[in-house]
From Swiss-Prot:
GO terms for biological process: L-histidine biosynthetic process. NCBIfam families: hisC. It comes from the Bacteria. It catalyses: L-histidinol phosphate + 2-oxoglutarate = 3-(imidazol-4-yl)-2-oxopropyl phosphate + L-glutamate. This is Histidinol-phosphate aminotransferase. Pathway: Amino-acid biosynthesis; L-histidine biosynthesis; L-histidine from 5-phospho-alpha-D-ribose 1-diphosphate: step 7/9. GO terms for molecular function: histidinol-phosphate transaminase activity; pyridoxal phosphate binding. The modification N6-(pyridoxal phosphate)lysine is found at residue 222. Homodimer.
């Protein structure tokens, strides 16, 4: 086969082991997954009711325009429907963005470490990837990113809060950054975890009307608890949306996914409960970190914490796994002595912290 040359040296995404697989390997009767930043509280009861009672005509293609969901989200953010695009998770939106803007003659700028799919998709398109190291505290080096932009740059990526560090860039700093980015360079503001930020930032979706080179990406996979439904979306100027729709598959979000997302966004009381629970979980880890001088906890603003224990990441990961908790080794994230842990229920956070104390 005459494969694209850009695929040489790349590998496919390798998901973590399933809970059942880990239990069988280690002889455990229970295991808690804290590796994929899923919502430990599940999803809204309104969503659960739809799941229990919904009848989907599986032989009929879904609404390719996601009309009802589009109206619901547009009303929620007070946007025009043409300022939205819906995709099979943010992963697909990232793929579409790289497809329309990157090729072997272009480059893209991003932080490192950050969400791995930016780099992966850029390399698939054969583009040059310019990675700007995070600052010592895990913050984006925005000045360094600006300096990396040249006439061949087509996309700049900002993950906010950043995955895997959890750092959050204030809105004023984002706007100051946007003011200095050339108007023909797209800035992707990936806000997959924005609903977890406490206190919530002011509404800023309409920034896309001021900055025509901005797209804000969000998802129903995290705080809304619909990871398996695969519904993500982008907010941008109508012309950006028009171009993306040219390459978007015609039936890319499922009928059931659209229905569940509509109910999910309606139940903001549940979202508030999730945010409060998550904030309390972060406080548990902050209190733990304060008790040990060698422990570094990166600023947590998502539904996960990145903790550097000064111990080889694989050792931490294996230790927690043997004791019933699946986490994410920092070795795969650019932090060789750290582990990323999804904020769980209070009792799970307490149990993990107790295990880490024993390890130290």
């Amino acid at each position: 086969m005459k494969w694209k040359k850009s695929l040489a040296g790349l590998s496919s995404y390798k998901p973590g082991k399933r809970e059942e697989e880990v239990m069988a390997e280690l002889g455990l009767t229970k295991i808690t997954k804290l590796s994929s930043n899923e919502n430990p509280l599940g999803t809204s009861k309104k969503v659960a009711a739809i799941q229990a009672n919904s009848s989907v005509e599986t032989e009929i293609y879904p609404d390719g325009w996601a009309s009802s969901l589009r109206k619901e989200v547009a009303d929620f953010y007070q946007l025009e429907e043409e300022e939205l695009i819906f995709t099979a998770g943010v992963d697909e939106l990232i793929e579409l963005l790289t497809r329309v803007l990157l090729d072997t003659t272009t480059n893209t700028v991003m932080a490192t470490p950050t969400f791995v799919q930016y780099r992966q998709n850029a390399l698939i398109e054969g583009a040059e990837v310019r990675e700007i190291p995070l600052l010592q505290d895990g913050e984006h080096d925005l000045e360094g990113m600006l300096n990396a932009i040249d006439e061949k740059t087509t996309i700049v990526w900002i993950c906010n809060p950043n995955n895997p560090t959890g750092n959050y860039i204030e809105l004023a700093d984002i706007q100051a950054f946007l003011d200095r980015v050339p108007s023909d360079v797209l800035v992707v503001l990936d806000e997959a975890y924005i609903e977890y930020v406490t206190p919530q930032p002011e509404k800023h979706e309409k920034l896309v009307r001021t900055y025509k080179n901005l797209i804000i990406t969000r998802t129903f996979s995290k705080i809304y608890g619909l990871a398996s439904a695969r519904v993500g979306y982008g907010i941008a100027d109508k012309e950006i949306i028009r171009q993306l729709n040219i390459v978007r598959p015609p039936f890319n979000t499922t009928s059931i996914g659209q229905k569940l997302a509509i109910e999910a966004i309606k139940d903001q009381a549940f979202i508030g409960e999730c945010r409060t629970s998550n904030a309390n979980g972060i406080k548990q880890y902050e209190a733990f970190a304060k008790r040990f001088e060698k422990v570094k906890l990166y600023p947590a603003n998502g539904n996960f914490v990145l903790i550097d224990l000064g111990i080889e990441a694989g050792t931490i990961f294996s230790y927690l796994e043997k004791n019933g908790y699946i986490t994410r080794s920092g070795a795969a994230l650019g932090f060789p002595t750290a582990v990323r842990i999804t904020i769980g229920k209070e009792e799970d956070n307490s149990a993990v912290i107790a295990l880490l104390e024993k390890l130290l």
